[in-house]
């Protein structure tokens, strides 16, 4: 019995996207970071949070606690809409999604090398080109029991999202091709 049949029979077993995290590693503070913030805001529709350097690296001119990156967390419909556009950009850049990108509980990451690959984006010489890492986290209905404050409980192993389930979900929902090594 395929996962699709199980999901139709038991809807509580169908995985869903918990969150999509978009990481923008600019590597320096200043103008490039503020321009990157505008780019990520146009792509996601949300204001980004600045990430700080954890340690000093004089070779790159980075000091500890200096803002050098940006990140945005998307949930719900915003996450799904962004992911559809991200997969289009991923295909345009000529990359493939490998099964090794998925961990044992179905979460996966991929990178988009150029933000201009997204639909509706054009190259602007004053902005330049920015790449990003996209991390997708899965869950099933009922995962709230592990994070709620009262009567917290563990998720049983049979209710965790499996790697194969996440791959099938991504292929069916977004039409992405996952290559098995």
Curated annotation (Swiss-Prot):
One of its GO terms (cellular component) is ribonucleoprotein complex. GO terms for biological process: translation. SUPFAM superfamilies: RL5-like. Gene3D superfamilies: 3.30.1440.10. InterPro entries: Ribosomal_uL5 (IPR002132), Ribosomal_uL5_arc (IPR022804), Ribosomal_uL5_C (IPR031309), Ribosomal_uL5_CS (IPR020929), Ribosomal_uL5_dom_sf (IPR022803), Ribosomal_uL5_N (IPR031310). Keywords: Ribonucleoprotein, Ribosomal protein, RNA-binding, rRNA-binding, tRNA-binding. GO terms for molecular function: rRNA binding; structural constituent of ribosome; tRNA binding. Pfam families: Ribosomal_L5, Ribosomal_L5_C. Belongs to the universal ribosomal protein uL5 family. Part of the 50S ribosomal subunit; contacts the 5S rRNA and probably tRNA. Forms a bridge to the 30S subunit in the 70S ribosome. This is one of the proteins that bind and probably mediate the attachment of the 5S RNA into the large ribosomal subunit, where it forms part of the central protuberance. In the 70S ribosome it contacts protein S13 of the 30S subunit (bridge B1b), connecting the 2 subunits; this bridge is implicated in subunit movement. May contact the P site tRNA; the 5S rRNA and some of its associated proteins might help stabilize positioning of ribosome-bound tRNAs. PANTHER family: 60S RIBOSOMAL PROTEIN L11-RELATED. This is Large ribosomal subunit protein uL5. It comes from Methanococcus vannielii (strain ATCC 35089 / DSM 1224 / JCM 13029 / OCM 148 / SB). The gene is rpl5.
């Amino acid at each position: 019995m395929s996962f699709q049949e199980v999901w139709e029979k038991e809807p509580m077993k169908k995985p869903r996207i918990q969150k999509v995290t978009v990481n923008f590693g600019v590597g320096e503070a200043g103008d490039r970071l503020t321009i990157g913030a505008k780019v990520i805001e146009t792509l996601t529709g949300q204001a980004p949070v600045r990430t700080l350097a954890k340690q000093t690296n004089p070779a790159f001119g980075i000091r500890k606690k200096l803002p050098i990156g940006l990140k945005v967390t998307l949930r719900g419909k915003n996450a799904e809409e962004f992911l559809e556009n991200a997969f289009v950009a991923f295909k345009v850049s000529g990359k493939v999604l490998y099964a090794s990108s998925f961990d044992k509980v179905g979460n996966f990451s991929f990178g988009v090398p150029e933000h201009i690959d997204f639909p509706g984006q054009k190259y602007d010489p004053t902005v330049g080109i920015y790449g990003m890492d996209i991390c997708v986290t899965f869950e099933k209905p009922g995962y709230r029991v592990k994070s709620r404050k009262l009567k917290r409980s563990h998720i049983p192993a049979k209710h965790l999202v499996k790697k194969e389930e996440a791959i099938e979900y991504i292929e069916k929902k977004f039409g992405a091709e996952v290559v098995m090594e």
